[in-house]
Amino acid sequence: MKSSAHDFAEAAERHLDDVHAFLVYLTGDRNVAEELTAETFARALERWRRYDPRRGSARTWLCQVARSTALDHFRAEERRRRRENRFSLQVPEAHEVVFGEGLSPELEGALSRMSAADRAVIALRVVLDLDAESAGAVLGISPTACSTRLSRALQRLEKEVGSGVAA
């Protein structure tokens, strides 16, 4: 189904904040999330003619593009780290990890210690309030698997918050 540039601009404007928030939670870094948000929308614009609203909402589709963009970024970072380690270069990570305005230090610390998969499902279901079907589509899993993953991620988050406070 063909969609116009106007439709893309409308969807981009409507869902920009959600995509950015998803990427902040996924990466744990506002600066990286901003770069990936720009890359996500550049990729989405190139692929917009393939978007079919009968297969899901624009928000879900854009989050799928964002997830793919983030995975590409993580793979590139891993390749970079391997190259640096191979040549014994020690390059410090100089970015600030910030998950969101108003989070307690305990919760922010707990989220930073969680896996990207756990942060992603929490961001999609809790922060962006996507249903299990939409979040599952973004993550490439069934709605049931998405609900299970969320439940387990929230249990791990609760343990992390408890261990962070006790430490």
Outline where the language-model segments fall:
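Arg/Lys-rich amphipathic alpha helix in sigma70-family domain 2
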Residues: E46, R50, Q64-R86, G100
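Amphipathic, Lys/Arg- and hydrophobic-enriched alpha-helical face
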Residues: A12-R30, E46-R47, C63, L111, ...
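Helix-turn-helix DNA-binding module
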Residues: S112, A116-A120, L128-T148, Q155-K159
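Structural recognition of an alpha-helix C-terminal capping motif at a helix-to-coil junction
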Residues: E35-A42, E46, G56-S68
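A short, charge-rich alpha-helical start-of-domain segment used by transcription regulators
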Residues: M1-A21, E34, L45, R119
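C-terminal flanking helix
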Residues: L16, H20, F41, S115, ...
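C-terminal edge and immediately downstream basic/flexible tail or linker adjoining helix-turn-helix-like DNA-binding
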Residues: K2-F8, E101, A137-G140, L154-A167
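Internal acidic/polar
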Residues: R80-S104, D131
